[in-house]
Every structure is written in structure tokens, then in C-alpha cells.
From Swiss-Prot:
Main location: membrane
Protein name, per record: Quaternary ammonium compound-resistance protein QacE
UniProt membrane topology term: Multi-pass membrane protein
GO CC terms, sorted: plasma membrane
Keyword flag Secreted: no
InterPro entries, sorted: Small_drug/metabolite_transptr, Small_multidrug_res
GO molecular function: transmembrane transporter activity
Similarity section: Belongs to the drug/metabolite transporter (DMT) superfamily. Small multidrug resistance (SMR) (TC 2.A.7.1) family.
Keywords: Cell membrane, Membrane, Plasmid, Transmembrane, Transmembrane helix, Transport
Domain of life: Bacteria
Listed transmembrane segments: 1-21, 30-50, 58-78, 85-105
Compartment(s) where it occurs, according to its Swiss-Prot or TrEMBL record: Cell membrane
The gene coding this protein: qacE
Functional note: Multidrug exporter. Is implicated for the resistance to bacteriocidal quaternary ammonium compounds.
């Protein structure tokens, strides 16, 4: 259970860091650049803890899949990124894949 909590923390850290990348303007703005560095540091530290209890393939699939969906949603909602019906279908498939991997696949057993 602790592994999944750590994975959520890793995903949140990665999402915050990636969201701040645009504001850092190529690491020329100090505050957003610090958020990027700290966020990625938190993300990778907690991902390393996750790997003690969750298989790397499962952890990385959940981390990257949900990260992509959340980042895309943030860009769509806050930054006006265009997202058509196929974009929503693709994100739905990513989430579906993560659910299948975790609920139905034996790969998630440790």
C-alpha cells in the first residue's frame, strides 16, 4: 500500500515539475526553474522507493501513463492546448491500459 502512495507522490512531483517547465523559459526564470528541479527530484526519489514494492514495468507504466494524461489535461484546461476527439480517445486508451495492467494482468503481482 505504501508503494502506491509513493507512486502518487512521484506522479504529483513529476506533473508539477513538467507543468513548470514552460514557465521556466528554458531555465532562465529562477522560481519556475527551482520548481522543476525540486519536482523532478521528488518524483525520482519517490519512484525509487516505489520500486521496492511494485515491479518496475507496472510502476513506470502507471507513472508515465497517468503523467501524460494529467499533463495533457492541465495544458488543455489552463494553457489552451487544442485537444480533439482523438486526443480524448487516446487518453482514454492510456488510462484503460493502466487499469488493465493493474487489475487484470499478472505482471502487477510482486
Amino acid at each position: 500500500m505504501k508503494g502506491w502512495l509513493f507512486l502518487v507522490i512521484a506522479i504529483v512531483g513529476e506533473v508539477i515539475a513538467t507543468s513548470a517547465l514552460k514557465s521556466s523559459e528554458g531555465f532562465t526564470k529562477l522560481a519556475p526553474s527551482a520548481v522543476v528541479i525540486i519536482g523532478y527530484g521528488i518524483a525520482f526519489y519517490f519512484l525509487s522507493l516505489v520500486l521496492k514494492s511494485i515491479p518496475v514495468g507496472v510502476a513506470y507504466a502507471v507513472w508515465s501513463g497517468l503523467g501524460v494524461v494529467i499533463i495533457t489535461a492541465i495544458a488543455w484546461l489552463l494553457h489552451g492546448q487544442k485537444l480533439d476527439a482523438w486526443g480524448f480517445v487516446g487518453m482514454g486508451l492510456i488510462v484503460s491500459g493502466v487499469v488493465v495492467l493493474n487489475l487484470l494482468s499478472k505482471a502487477s503481482a510482486h
